Design a protein with these regions (language model features):
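SF2 helicase/translocase NTPase motor core
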Residues: 1-110, 114, 120, 144-187
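Conserved active-site segment of CheY-like receiver
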Residues: 123-125
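A short helix-turn-beta junction within AAA+ P-loop NTPase domains corresponding to the substrate/partner-engaging
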Residues: 133-146
Length: 187
């Protein structure tokens, strides 16, 4: 997917946890240990936490000068870290409410600037509720439920679908172990 966007001169952002930076940096480097050297990847790597920072530097980039809305593709490694949805933190005396990383990603990268596509990667998804999955999916449709509702071609909204799925799962999980089967869940 990255190569496809790169071949069309599109700008690519990879957001990853700090511990994965070296992996992503190796894949775009001229290092001998780069297994994808011939692909000549070109993308920008930032940490998930960089979204909340307004100053300082990250991997040689001045964060004050980054145009977050200029990326055609954002690849989110360990995307389950964005499962909690949008929240704004405020204190009683706080005149400057702060958006969490999820809202920073949505507002600064996905919604602003060029039309941005989202590729979410997670080998070990940690979803505690169906709402966690819904929040991740919302990144792909810019948090605008009407967009996905129009495409679903169902009588239920995306919110209703996830609410019903959670209710069905809750009923199933309350069953005795002997009755908690895949068939019982799908019925």
């Amino acid at each position: 997917v990255i190569k496809y966007y790169q071949s069309r001169n599109k700008s690519i952002l990879v957001l990853c946890p700090k511990k994965l930076y070296d992996n992503w940096n190796t894949f775009k480097s001229p290092y001998e240990n780069n297994p994808l050297l011939r692909d000549r990847f070109n993308y920008h790597v930032f940490y998930h936490t960089d979204l909340s920072r307004r100053s300082g530097s990250s991997n040689g980039y001045d964060l004050e000068r980054i145009n977050w809305g200029n990326f055609d593709l954002v690849v989110i490694d360990e995307s389950h870290n964005f499962r909690n949805g949008g929240k704004v933190t405020t204190d009683e005396n706080d005149e400057n409410p702060r958006e969490n990383r999820y809202l920073q990603l949505l507002n600064r990268v996905i919604r602003s600037g060029v039309k941005t596509k989202v590729l979410m990667l997670s080998a070990t998804p940690v979803n505690n509720r169906f709402n966690d999955l819904k929040n991740q999916l919302a990144l792909a449709y810019e948090g605008e439920a009407d967009q996905i509702n129009a495409l679903l071609n169902t009588t239920s909204t995306i919110d209703d679908i996830f609410r019903q799925a959670q209710a069905a799962f809750n009923r199933w999980s309350d069953l005795p172990d002997s009755e908690r089967t895949t068939k019982a869940l799908l019925d």
